[in-house]
Amino acid sequence: MSSEHIQNKLALLPDQPGCYLMKDRQGTIIYVGKAKILKNRVRSYFSGTHDSKTQRLVQEIVDFEYIVTSSNVEALLLEINLIKKHDPRFNIRLKDDKTYPFIKITNERHPRLIITRQVKKDKGKYFGPYPNVYAANEVKRILDRLYPLRKCSTLPNKVCLYYHLGQCLAPCVFDVEASKYKEMQDEIVAFLNGGYKTVKNDLMKKMQEAAENMEFEKAGEFRDQINAIETTMEKQKMTMNDFVDRDVFGYAIDKGWMCVQVFFIRQGKLIERDVSQFPFYNDADEDFLTFIGQFYQKANHIPPKEIYLPDDVDSEAVQAVVPDTKIIVPQRGNKKDLVKLAYKNAKIALNEKFMLLERNEERTVGAVERLGEAMGIPTPSRVEAFDNSNIHGTDPVSAMVTFLDGKPSKNDYRKYKIKTVEGPDDYATMREVIRRRYWRVLKEELPMPDLILIDGGKGQIDSAKDVLTNELGLDIPVAGLAKDDKHRTSQLLFGDPLEIVPLERNSQEFYLLQRMQDEVHRFAITFHRQLRSKTGFQSILDGIPGVGPGRKKKLLKHFGSMKKLKEASVEEIKEAGVPLNVAEEVHKHITAFNEKAKNTEQK
């Protein structure tokens, strides 16, 4: 993916929390990160200066994607799962497999409330995971004060300090009814599932009372408890408090296109997603059902235990496709939120697609139209651009590139070895190339360009126009692209007499001309270098006394390349099996050639 395409994607990043996945040239995910605001965080990688390790990462990024979440906490939890899933090499690799903590009510005769990093199928009640260890412990401390479950891992022989603090019922000494535990467990579950708001309001009242009574230390403690509740109790739509495998579907449609996003929830966590975009031709709901049918035909898409679908989808039809899976159309709660989130990401992806298309249209077709307006000619939908390349007239070549509606048409590129011109004569070279190109266009009835661009000034433009008009009888607009002292596109010359076409340097039409000039220059230089690499060894040795075809082959076999021969001393050349006087002549000839060619590569 080009850097320009990345810049276009950066411009479309949403102002929302989420996770981003950086990819290298092979499409491998090399880094996963999270952001409170995706737009700001992802853009920061491609602007400003970075330390060495970040620079190494940025140098390998050629593409990225992102997943929008409902909160920053959710982004953090998703980031954990994505890193575990993809193991990106630029992410920190922990030595152990610790994850974020859960609050657990144990399944014991005398249950405990504990913090654990291990989630097991032991009939305990788990809540989380929580992204902030300190805050999770603070919430547990609040619960310990409100609900006096036992604290000891094994029952002691006598009551402990917690009993005297009112934080334990002391089952080690007293009988505690199971109904009492059930009552407390139900209240804890309610607290962790939203009932914390009542407790939070009570704490706020206590904090205000403590502040009014000048008990600032106590007020600060209440404040910390309130902050802990707010931090840890934020809803986490992407994590389910069970181990059920689910696929969550959401889709969006616009302008005849559909985007389907599938969230893969495994062991209760979102670990991956699938994004598909395609045109639909029938009813959207029907095409969506077709997609699901095809989706589960793939060997790597094993139907999970449950599938969540949006409203208005024929769940019975889906059930027929995956008969052993439970089909659910959620109506409320976290399950409904997950479907909404899949839809939200599908809508964002589809909007991004069309915005990228619009931006591409603006920089191609739109730029071509405005270029024609600025020049006072019909829209130049087909533009053919020419450039010459040689070194002191040796191996002169020319190249032509074609742009259709502002986009390169590489099948229409052409290369030319100059046949009739000796020495560095750009005007004569341009005449030959224009003659050869458009004589063939006439003969083979090929498409005529709407505009010819010449990489050069008045002399090259006049040479091209003279051949077109006076030799071939063609009336095609010809313009020239001039460069500044830094070899950058600076002006467009057109008209009779030639005038500078007024173009804003930050306009899309000017950028289009830059791309055309850079592309034809690249193409010409590449062709010239290829030609030189094939003929350079032979041509440089031509004319040296004592060096015939046999010794040329001997030198080539010994040194392997022209570069090594150019760097060789007389003694090293002699070691190739040639007489001393011949070695001296070869060294003298190559030294003179190097001096002549140094820093003189030109168009």
Swiss-Prot record:
Coiled-coil features, chain-numbered ranges: none
Primary subcellular site in the record, as a coarse category: cytoplasm
Listed SMART domains: GIYc
Keywords: Cytoplasm, DNA damage, DNA excision, DNA repair, Excision nuclease, SOS response
Signal peptide extent: none
Record keyword S-adenosyl-L-methionine present: no
Stretches assigned to the UVR domain: 197-232
GO biological process, one term: nucleotide-excision repair
Cited Gene3D superfamilies: 5' to 3' exonuclease, C-terminal subdomain, GIY-YIG endonuclease, UVR domain, UvrC, RNAse H endonuclease domain
InterPro entries for the chain: DisA/LigA_HHH (IPR041663), GIY-YIG_endonuc (IPR000305), GIY-YIG_endonuc_sf (IPR035901), GIY-YIG_UvrC_Cho (IPR047296), RuvA_2-like (IPR010994), UVR_dom (IPR001943), UVR_dom_sf (IPR036876), UvrABC_protein_C (IPR050066)
Pfam families, per database record: GIY-YIG (PF01541), HHH_2 (PF12826), UVR (PF02151), UvrC_RNaseH (PF22920), UvrC_RNaseH_dom (PF08459)
MF term (GO), any: DNA binding
Domain of life: Bacteria
Compartmental location: Cytoplasm
A GO CC term attached to the entry: cytoplasm
Record keyword DNA damage present: yes
Ranges of residues in domain GIY-YIG: 15-92
Alphabetized PANTHER family for the sequence: UVRABC SYSTEM PROTEIN C, UVRC/OXIDOREDUCTASE
Function: The UvrABC repair system catalyzes the recognition and processing of DNA lesions. UvrC both incises the 5' and 3' sides of the lesion. The N-terminal half is responsible for the 3' incision and the C-terminal half is responsible for the 5' incision.
Family classification: Belongs to the UvrC family.
Subunit structure, as described in the record: Interacts with UvrB in an incision complex.
Name recorded for this polypeptide: UvrABC system protein C
Organism of origin: Listeria monocytogenes serotype 4b (strain CLIP80459)
Gene name of this polypeptide: uvrC
